[in-house]
Amino acid sequence: MPKDPIRVLVTGAAGQLAYSLIPIIAKGHVFGDDQPVILHLLELPRMMSVLNGVVMELVDGAYPLLQEVIATDEEKTAFTGIDVAFLVGSMPRKPGMDRRDLLTANAKIYQSNGHALDQYAKKSVKIALKLKVSSSDVRNVIIWGNHSSTQLPDVSHAFVNVGGRNVRVADAINDDGYIQGEFLSIVQKRGGAVIAARKLSSAMSAAKAAADHMHDWWHGTPEGHWVSMAVLSDGSYGSPADVMFSYPVYIDSQRQWRIVDGLSMSDFVRQKIQATGKELVEERNEALAFCKE
């Protein structure tokens, strides 16, 4: 029996990240190859002509699962009745800009999105080489904390398939200096490196990450596997409370997440978690101040 379509919103739909994300959704790679979708695409009035071009490409693509496309510059139309939202519309980061420079503009954007989400959307809506192996061979790497240069990539509990055997990543690399130094720096500074090379912020990889993230939320995580997800902090692992903090989480078949508990932690990791948590508290307070102005 055919499934009823779900309504999926993408904000900033004429932007470069959305341009990479929208076809991934339309192809069924996020919600399943038997799940019809109705796309709601939201843009600013001045970008509607560009968005109309995106709609034309979607029509020309003849995606079997795409039942309808609603392109609009009105939040009420965009948010009404949606099941899932990808809130990717924001001021882009440019060369020389720090993430903190974007707080003022983007706090206002997401404040408006939040009001519309609460008022119009369904209440069930979901917001969304070292070892010379494939990334699919690696599992349970953790990203702790903020999406910034203080984020902490942690391989303490990660495993990699090497020659058919599951091996701890830390044992396979066998180089704490690399793990706590070069590897850490590469991940933390990746966004800036992409901007320096492309003169634009990440789009293709960011869209893939958003799609993978929503896929895991929609379908759940396999037994024994976790993913990193920014959720409202409960103070676990010494993180500050009441900020959106990235933790390792399990997701069940009912799309409910829970923070993985009981993980052992080195002093190095604990100190980095405290540092990224401190930054998040500062950014939260700044963003809230902007919203009150």
Question: Predicted regions span which residues?
Answer:
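Redox-cofactor binding/interface segments in oxidoreductases and associated redox assembly factors
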Residues: 85-87
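Rossmann-like NAD(P)(H) cofactor-binding subdomain of soluble oxidoreductases
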Residues: 99-130
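Eukaryotic N-terminal low-complexity, Ser/Thr- and Lys/Arg-rich leader segments
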Residues: 1-5, 292-293
